Regions:
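Low-complexity, acidic/polar, glycine-enriched regions of mature
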Residues: 20-180
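Bacterial Sec-dependent N-terminal signal peptides
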Residues: 1-26
Length: 180
């Protein structure tokens, strides 16, 4: 009996040790086929558009999402609900220091720091989001199906010192940007 228990403990220890050595697989995002879709709200409505990724990757261990990192090209901000002069004006304004200050801050980053499975192919994630040099944690859901992943984030722009158009800080509470 003692030998059987000892053998079970040895097998369990070997199995647990082996699981600690499961390789992390990094899958690079195809940035030519991927985009950030955004929708920004204002008092009188909203605007939406896209931003390109410079790079991105997701990390998996035994086919389970464990992390990732994305670098967003803020110079690529593109409003898609307007055209002509109004589109050009809004794109320029979003790139200016009033909003994202892309000359000084050409990229934004999202580094996934914690992932918990919430269902089949679904995860609750926490990441460090850096916009305009300011890094804050953000929680979101991410779904991964084969080679496709989608996530939706709600970001309070005022937390990143993007307060254009407000009389005071309190006027900006509740302003958000949806990213998918």
């Amino acid at each position: 009996m003692k030998k059987r228990i000892l053998n079970s403990v040895v097998v369990l220890a070997v199995a647990m040790g082996a699981s600690a050595f499961v390789d992390v697989v990094t899958k690079e995002v195809n940035v030519k086929q991927s985009q950030v879709h955004w929708k920004g709200y204002k008092v009188t409505g909203s605007h939406y558009g896209t931003i390109d990724l410079k790079s991105g990757s997701l990390e998996f261990q035994a086919d389970v999402l464990t992390g990732g990192e994305f670098i967003v090209d803020m110079n690529s901000i593109n409003t898609t609900d307007l055209s002509g002069e109004y589109k050009d004006q809004l794109d320029g304004h979003l790139k200016s220091d009033d909003f994202f200050g892309v000359e000084k801050y050409p990229t934004a980053t999202l580094k996934i720091t914690k992932v918990t499975a919430s269902g089949k192919n679904s995860y609750d994630a926490t990441a460090d989001l850096t916009i305009k040099g300011k890094t804050l944690p953000v929680d979101f859901e991410i779904s991964v199906y084969g080679s496709k992943a989608t996530a939706n984030l709600k970001i309070d722009r005022s937390k990143y010192n993007i307060r254009y158009g407000s009389g005071s800080f309190f006027d900006n509470l509740g302003r958000r940007v949806d990213v998918s």
